[in-house]
């Protein structure tokens, strides 16, 4: 691991590290916020998964989460959204390739060699965090848009690994919307059965459950009618008896202005599960 950046903020330390990711076969960066913790007590960890086009930088520079992580004494980890590097396959479009890993394990070439983000987020990154920082072994996960999709899928499929899950403006039925259909076709092939393991709505229909989930969605979000399918997800959860707290917010869009407005409530929500 190599320290790339370090900034003091709200009494704690916002850091960016680089490491050679075996799962992805490339160098990866991740951000970690360490609240002021002079006694080096073990703390819970919240993983944040960002959306399309993002790196590890967007969340740490735009959301203002550090104030709340410091207050609630939680470590927050924000990885990049895909493998990176000149040797890593890419696409000219914003919604495929680098910056658009979709938090899955690709099976199709040329993507399969590097695009194993599901395994990276589930196993390699937490192992690295827990070996190098003062953690208590408890994890929660949250994300935005493509990252909200990733957070929900990881939590549903690995209930024992995450204490809680939340999302901002998540892609809830990627198998049925343009973003997901494009990415899944490329990464997983044309067999739609293979897509279902990375579709939160489908997982709930299959019987996967979590203790509860929290979702915030802006009503001025330009992607709400075509890409997110929030109302359908609420109905899927109702039929499956899966508790979900979805809050719609008048006037808010898909941007980090929306995330910054409510990130404090999400940090507080997860902190209760991480004690």
Curated annotation (Swiss-Prot):
Q: What does this protein do?
A: Serine hydrolase involved in the detoxification of formaldehyde. Hydrolyzes S-formylglutathione to glutathione and formate.
Q: Name a Pfam family for this protein.
A: Esterase
Q: What is this protein called?
A: S-formylglutathione hydrolase
Any one of the GO CC terms? cytosol
The UniProt record lists the EC number as 3.1.2.12
| GO function terms (MF aspect) | carboxylic ester hydrolase activity; S-formylglutathione hydrolase activity
Provide the GO biological process annotations.
Answer: formaldehyde catabolic process
């Amino acid at each position: 691991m190599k320290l790339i950046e370090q900034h003091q903020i709200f009494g704690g330390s916002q850091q960016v590290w680089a490491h050679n990711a075996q799962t992805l076969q490339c160098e990866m960066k991740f951000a970690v916020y360490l609240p002021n913790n002079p006694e080096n007590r073990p703390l819970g960890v919240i993983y944040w998964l960002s959306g399309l086009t993002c790196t590890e930088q967007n969340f740490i520079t735009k959301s203002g989460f550090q104030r709340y992580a410091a207050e609630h004494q939680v470590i927050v980890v924000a990885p990049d959204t895909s493998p990176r590097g000149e040797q890593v396959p890419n696409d000219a479009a914003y919604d495929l390739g680098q910056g658009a890993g979709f938090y899955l394990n690709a099976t199709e070439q040329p993507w399969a060699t590097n695009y194993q983000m599901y395994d990276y987020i589930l196993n390699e990154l937490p192992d690295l965090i827990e070996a190098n920082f003062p953690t208590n072994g408890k994890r929660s996960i949250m994300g935005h848009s493509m990252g909200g999709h990733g957070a929900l899928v990881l939590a549903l499929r690995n209930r024992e690994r995450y204490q809680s899950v939340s999302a901002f403006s998540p892609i809830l039925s990627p198998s049925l919307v343009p973003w997901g259909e494009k990415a899944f076709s490329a990464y997983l092939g044309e067999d739609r059965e293979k897509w279902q393991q990375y579709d939160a709505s489908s997982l709930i229909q299959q019987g996967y459950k979590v203790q509860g989930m929290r979702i915030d969605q802006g009503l001025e979000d330009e992607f709400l009618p075509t890409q997110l399918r929030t109302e359908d997800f609420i109905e899927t959860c109702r039929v499956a008896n899966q508790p979900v707290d979805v809050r719609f917010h008048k006037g808010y869009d898909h941007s980090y202005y929306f995330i910054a407005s409510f990130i404090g409530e999400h940090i507080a929500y997860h902190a209760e599960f991480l004690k």
